[in-house]
Amino acid sequence: MKTLVWVEHDGSTVKDPTLPVITAAALLGEVHLIVAGKGVDAVAAEAAKIAGVDKVHVADDAAFEHVLPENVAPLIVALMADHDAFLAPATAIGKNIAPRVAALLDVMQISEILSVDGPDTFTRPTYAGNAIATVQTSDAKKVITVRGTAFAKAEREGGSGTIEAVTSTGDAGLATFVSAEIAKSERPELTSAKIIVSGGRALQNAENFHTIIEPLADKLGAGVGASRAAVDAGYVPNDYQVGQTGKIVAPEVYFAIGISGAIQHLAGMKDSKVIIAINKDEDAPIFQVADIGLVGDLFKLVPELTEKL
Protein backbone atom coordinates (compact mmCIF):
# COMPACT_ATOMS: atom_id res chain seq x y z
CA MET A 1 0.00 0.00 0.00
CA LYS A 2 1.42 3.37 -1.04
CA THR A 3 0.49 6.46 0.95
CA LEU A 4 1.03 10.04 -0.19
CA VAL A 5 1.67 12.58 2.58
CA TRP A 6 1.27 16.33 2.21
CA VAL A 7 4.36 18.19 3.45
CA GLU A 8 3.77 21.52 5.16
CA HIS A 9 6.80 23.79 4.88
CA ASP A 10 7.85 27.43 5.02
CA GLY A 11 9.87 27.35 1.82
CA SER A 12 13.06 26.20 3.50
CA THR A 13 12.22 23.61 6.18
CA VAL A 14 9.60 20.94 6.88
CA LYS A 15 7.12 22.08 9.53
CA ASP A 16 6.46 19.96 12.63
CA PRO A 17 2.80 19.11 11.83
CA THR A 18 4.04 16.92 8.97
CA LEU A 19 6.02 14.58 11.24
CA PRO A 20 3.13 12.82 13.07
CA VAL A 21 1.42 12.30 9.71
CA ILE A 22 4.47 10.41 8.45
CA THR A 23 4.27 8.19 11.54
CA ALA A 24 0.62 7.45 10.79
CA ALA A 25 1.35 6.80 7.11
CA ALA A 26 4.10 4.31 7.99
CA LEU A 27 1.44 2.14 9.65
CA LEU A 28 -0.22 1.74 6.25
CA GLY A 29 2.86 0.80 4.24
CA GLU A 30 5.18 2.61 1.85
CA VAL A 31 5.47 6.35 2.58
CA HIS A 32 5.75 8.90 -0.22
CA LEU A 33 5.79 12.66 0.37
CA ILE A 34 4.64 15.48 -1.88
CA VAL A 35 6.55 18.76 -1.60
CA ALA A 36 4.92 21.53 -3.63
CA GLY A 37 6.10 25.12 -3.95
CA LYS A 38 8.57 27.38 -5.71
CA GLY A 39 12.28 26.75 -5.16
CA VAL A 40 11.73 23.89 -2.72
CA ASP A 41 14.83 21.75 -3.37
CA ALA A 42 16.08 22.30 0.19
CA VAL A 43 12.72 21.23 1.62
CA ALA A 44 12.73 18.08 -0.51
CA ALA A 45 16.28 17.21 0.57
CA GLU A 46 15.32 17.62 4.23
CA ALA A 47 12.12 15.62 3.76
CA ALA A 48 14.03 12.72 2.20
CA LYS A 49 16.08 12.36 5.40
CA ILE A 50 13.03 11.89 7.65
CA ALA A 51 12.86 8.38 9.12
CA GLY A 52 10.39 6.11 7.35
CA VAL A 53 10.23 8.05 4.08
CA ASP A 54 10.65 5.99 0.91
CA LYS A 55 10.20 8.66 -1.77
CA VAL A 56 9.72 12.41 -2.10
CA HIS A 57 7.77 13.81 -5.04
CA VAL A 58 8.66 17.41 -5.86
CA ALA A 59 6.37 19.79 -7.75
CA ASP A 60 8.35 22.99 -8.28
CA ASP A 61 6.10 25.61 -9.85
CA ALA A 62 5.11 29.20 -9.10
CA ALA A 63 1.48 27.98 -9.10
CA PHE A 64 2.17 26.25 -5.76
CA GLU A 65 4.19 29.02 -4.13
CA HIS A 66 1.33 30.24 -1.92
CA VAL A 67 -0.30 26.81 -1.49
CA LEU A 68 -3.61 27.79 -3.04
CA PRO A 69 -5.76 24.66 -2.52
CA GLU A 70 -7.44 25.20 -5.88
CA ASN A 71 -4.05 24.59 -7.52
CA VAL A 72 -2.73 21.93 -5.15
CA ALA A 73 -5.76 19.61 -5.17
CA PRO A 74 -5.52 18.70 -8.90
CA LEU A 75 -1.81 17.94 -8.43
CA ILE A 76 -2.56 15.50 -5.63
CA VAL A 77 -5.41 13.90 -7.57
CA ALA A 78 -3.01 13.28 -10.47
CA LEU A 79 -0.50 11.64 -8.11
CA MET A 80 -3.22 9.49 -6.54
CA ALA A 81 -3.29 7.39 -9.71
CA ASP A 82 -0.24 5.63 -8.23
CA HIS A 83 -1.17 5.84 -4.54
CA ASP A 84 -3.77 4.21 -2.32
CA ALA A 85 -4.16 6.89 0.35
CA PHE A 86 -3.57 10.59 0.87
CA LEU A 87 -2.80 11.86 4.37
CA ALA A 88 -2.53 15.49 5.49
CA PRO A 89 -2.12 17.22 8.86
CA ALA A 90 -5.38 18.39 10.43
CA THR A 91 -4.22 22.00 10.16
CA ALA A 92 -5.84 24.94 8.42
CA ILE A 93 -3.98 24.05 5.22
CA GLY A 94 -4.63 20.32 5.45
CA LYS A 95 -8.31 20.87 6.16
CA ASN A 96 -8.52 23.09 3.09
CA ILE A 97 -6.81 20.69 0.71
CA ALA A 98 -8.10 17.26 1.79
CA PRO A 99 -11.85 17.87 1.22
CA ARG A 100 -11.14 19.13 -2.29
CA VAL A 101 -9.08 16.04 -3.06
CA ALA A 102 -11.83 13.79 -1.69
CA ALA A 103 -14.46 15.58 -3.77
CA LEU A 104 -12.41 15.32 -6.96
CA LEU A 105 -11.81 11.61 -6.30
CA ASP A 106 -15.47 11.14 -5.31
CA VAL A 107 -14.59 9.41 -2.04
CA MET A 108 -15.33 9.92 1.64
CA GLN A 109 -12.86 11.94 3.69
CA ILE A 110 -11.98 10.64 7.15
CA SER A 111 -11.15 13.52 9.48
CA GLU A 112 -8.65 13.82 12.33
CA ILE A 113 -7.81 10.16 12.86
CA LEU A 114 -6.42 9.10 16.22
CA SER A 115 -5.19 5.63 15.28
CA VAL A 116 -4.70 3.27 12.36
CA ASP A 117 -6.38 -0.06 13.14
CA GLY A 118 -5.94 -1.55 9.68
CA PRO A 119 -5.49 -0.62 6.02
CA ASP A 120 -9.10 0.54 5.86
CA THR A 121 -10.00 1.06 9.54
CA PHE A 122 -9.33 4.12 11.69
CA THR A 123 -10.53 5.81 14.86
CA ARG A 124 -11.55 9.44 15.12
CA PRO A 125 -13.14 11.65 17.80
CA THR A 126 -16.82 12.52 17.76
CA TYR A 127 -19.20 14.43 20.06
CA ALA A 128 -16.45 16.95 20.87
CA GLY A 129 -14.06 14.17 21.79
CA ASN A 130 -16.40 12.52 24.29
CA ALA A 131 -16.68 9.42 22.11
CA ILE A 132 -14.31 7.66 19.75
CA ALA A 133 -15.74 6.32 16.50
CA THR A 134 -14.20 3.43 14.58
CA VAL A 135 -14.54 4.11 10.87
CA GLN A 136 -14.09 1.57 8.09
CA THR A 137 -13.98 2.66 4.47
CA SER A 138 -14.51 0.65 1.31
CA ASP A 139 -13.17 3.42 -0.95
CA ALA A 140 -10.31 2.34 -3.19
CA LYS A 141 -8.62 5.70 -2.58
CA LYS A 142 -8.49 6.99 0.97
CA VAL A 143 -8.31 10.67 1.94
CA ILE A 144 -7.49 11.31 5.58
CA THR A 145 -6.50 14.14 7.90
CA VAL A 146 -4.42 13.25 10.95
CA ARG A 147 -4.66 14.76 14.42
CA GLY A 148 -1.02 15.45 15.19
CA THR A 149 -1.31 15.04 18.94
CA ALA A 150 -2.33 11.38 18.52
CA PHE A 151 0.90 10.18 16.88
CA ALA A 152 4.58 10.49 17.74
CA LYS A 153 6.67 12.75 15.53
CA ALA A 154 8.81 10.95 12.98
CA GLU A 155 12.53 11.51 13.50
CA ARG A 156 14.00 14.16 11.20
CA GLU A 157 17.09 12.02 10.58
CA GLY A 158 17.53 8.39 9.62
CA GLY A 159 15.72 8.22 6.30
CA SER A 160 17.14 7.90 2.80
CA GLY A 161 14.20 8.48 0.50
CA THR A 162 14.65 9.06 -3.20
CA ILE A 163 13.67 12.40 -4.73
CA GLU A 164 11.62 12.53 -7.90
CA ALA A 165 10.37 15.56 -9.83
CA VAL A 166 6.75 15.34 -10.96
CA THR A 167 4.87 17.09 -13.72
CA SER A 168 3.07 20.19 -12.51
CA THR A 169 -0.67 20.53 -13.10
CA GLY A 170 -0.14 24.29 -13.22
CA ASP A 171 -2.46 27.12 -12.28
CA ALA A 172 -6.13 26.11 -12.24
CA GLY A 173 -7.13 29.73 -12.74
CA LEU A 174 -9.71 29.58 -9.95
CA ALA A 175 -7.99 31.76 -7.35
CA THR A 176 -5.34 34.45 -7.19
CA PHE A 177 -3.02 35.17 -4.28
CA VAL A 178 -3.38 38.78 -3.13
CA SER A 179 -1.53 39.11 0.16
CA ALA A 180 -0.90 37.46 3.51
CA GLU A 181 -0.77 39.05 6.95
CA ILE A 182 1.29 36.88 9.25
CA ALA A 183 1.06 37.50 12.98
CA LYS A 184 4.54 37.59 14.50
CA SER A 185 5.25 36.67 18.10
CA GLU A 186 8.33 35.84 20.13
CA ARG A 187 6.30 33.25 22.02
CA PRO A 188 6.11 29.62 20.85
CA GLU A 189 3.37 28.74 18.38
CA LEU A 190 0.48 27.03 20.15
CA THR A 191 0.56 23.72 18.32
CA SER A 192 4.29 23.23 19.02
CA ALA A 193 4.63 24.86 22.47
CA LYS A 194 5.74 22.64 25.36
CA ILE A 195 3.95 24.88 27.86
CA ILE A 196 0.73 26.81 27.24
CA VAL A 197 -0.93 29.38 29.50
CA SER A 198 -4.57 29.91 28.55
CA GLY A 199 -7.07 32.41 29.92
CA GLY A 200 -10.85 32.48 29.95
CA ARG A 201 -13.71 34.91 30.23
CA ALA A 202 -13.23 35.17 34.01
CA LEU A 203 -10.36 37.58 33.31
CA GLN A 204 -13.13 40.13 32.60
CA ASN A 205 -11.38 42.24 29.95
CA ALA A 206 -8.47 42.43 27.51
CA GLU A 207 -6.28 44.48 29.86
CA ASN A 208 -6.55 41.88 32.61
CA PHE A 209 -5.80 39.11 30.13
CA HIS A 210 -2.55 40.78 29.11
CA THR A 211 -1.46 41.78 32.64
CA ILE A 212 -2.33 38.44 34.28
CA ILE A 213 -1.71 35.78 31.63
CA GLU A 214 1.22 37.13 29.62
CA PRO A 215 3.72 37.71 32.49
CA LEU A 216 3.27 34.09 33.60
CA ALA A 217 3.70 32.87 30.04
CA ASP A 218 6.84 34.97 29.60
CA LYS A 219 8.34 33.58 32.81
CA LEU A 220 7.73 30.03 31.57
CA GLY A 221 8.64 30.61 27.93
CA ALA A 222 5.13 29.46 27.13
CA GLY A 223 2.62 29.94 24.36
CA VAL A 224 -0.54 31.92 25.12
CA GLY A 225 -3.99 30.49 24.45
CA ALA A 226 -7.58 31.38 25.23
CA SER A 227 -11.03 29.89 25.48
CA ARG A 228 -13.63 30.68 22.85
CA ALA A 229 -15.49 32.82 25.38
CA ALA A 230 -12.39 35.00 25.85
CA VAL A 231 -11.92 35.30 22.09
CA ASP A 232 -15.59 36.11 21.49
CA ALA A 233 -15.40 38.77 24.21
CA GLY A 234 -12.55 40.42 22.31
CA TYR A 235 -9.80 39.85 24.87
CA VAL A 236 -7.45 38.33 22.26
CA PRO A 237 -7.49 37.53 18.52
CA ASN A 238 -9.00 34.35 17.10
CA ASP A 239 -5.62 32.69 16.53
CA TYR A 240 -5.25 32.31 20.31
CA GLN A 241 -8.30 30.04 20.55
CA VAL A 242 -7.86 26.51 21.88
CA GLY A 243 -10.69 24.06 21.42
CA GLN A 244 -12.84 22.13 19.00
CA THR A 245 -13.25 25.17 16.74
CA GLY A 246 -9.75 26.49 17.48
CA LYS A 247 -6.40 24.75 17.80
CA ILE A 248 -5.91 21.23 19.11
CA VAL A 249 -2.93 21.15 21.46
CA ALA A 250 -1.15 18.61 23.66
CA PRO A 251 1.72 20.38 25.46
CA GLU A 252 3.74 19.02 28.36
CA VAL A 253 1.98 21.49 30.69
CA TYR A 254 -1.30 23.33 30.13
CA PHE A 255 -2.48 26.12 32.44
CA ALA A 256 -6.25 26.76 32.31
CA ILE A 257 -6.81 30.06 34.12
CA GLY A 258 -10.35 31.31 34.59
CA ILE A 259 -11.62 28.67 32.17
CA SER A 260 -14.69 26.73 33.29
CA GLY A 261 -14.05 23.80 30.96
CA ALA A 262 -16.76 23.71 28.30
CA ILE A 263 -16.81 20.51 26.24
CA GLN A 264 -15.57 22.36 23.18
CA HIS A 265 -12.51 23.65 25.05
CA LEU A 266 -11.72 20.30 26.64
CA ALA A 267 -11.75 18.70 23.20
CA GLY A 268 -8.81 20.88 22.23
CA MET A 269 -6.51 20.39 25.23
CA LYS A 270 -7.44 17.27 27.20
CA ASP A 271 -4.49 15.30 25.75
CA SER A 272 -2.03 17.64 27.51
CA LYS A 273 0.42 15.74 29.71
CA VAL A 274 -0.20 17.85 32.84
CA ILE A 275 -3.21 20.16 33.23
CA ILE A 276 -3.16 22.87 35.90
CA ALA A 277 -6.47 24.63 36.52
CA ILE A 278 -7.09 27.84 38.47
CA ASN A 279 -10.74 28.76 39.02
CA LYS A 280 -12.83 30.18 41.86
CA ASP A 281 -15.65 27.69 41.14
CA GLU A 282 -14.72 24.37 42.72
CA ASP A 283 -17.43 22.65 40.66
CA ALA A 284 -16.06 23.87 37.31
CA PRO A 285 -15.80 21.00 34.78
CA ILE A 286 -12.14 21.84 34.15
CA PHE A 287 -11.25 20.25 37.51
CA GLN A 288 -12.51 16.87 36.23
CA VAL A 289 -9.58 16.68 33.80
CA ALA A 290 -7.02 18.70 35.78
CA ASP A 291 -4.00 17.01 37.35
CA ILE A 292 -3.51 20.00 39.66
CA GLY A 293 -6.36 22.27 40.70
CA LEU A 294 -6.27 25.56 42.59
CA VAL A 295 -9.58 26.93 43.83
CA GLY A 296 -9.36 30.64 44.43
CA ASP A 297 -9.20 34.15 43.04
CA LEU A 298 -7.06 34.10 39.90
CA PHE A 299 -6.32 37.81 40.33
CA LYS A 300 -4.41 36.92 43.52
CA LEU A 301 -3.13 33.43 42.75
CA VAL A 302 -1.63 34.02 39.31
CA PRO A 303 0.45 37.13 40.20
CA GLU A 304 1.75 35.29 43.28
CA LEU A 305 2.66 32.28 41.16
CA THR A 306 4.38 34.49 38.59
CA GLU A 307 6.36 36.25 41.32
CA LYS A 308 7.57 32.95 42.81
CA LEU A 309 8.90 31.64 39.50
Cite the ranges covered by each PLM segment.
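N-terminal glycine-rich FAD/FM-binding segment characteristic of electron-transfer flavoproteins
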Residues: 1-309
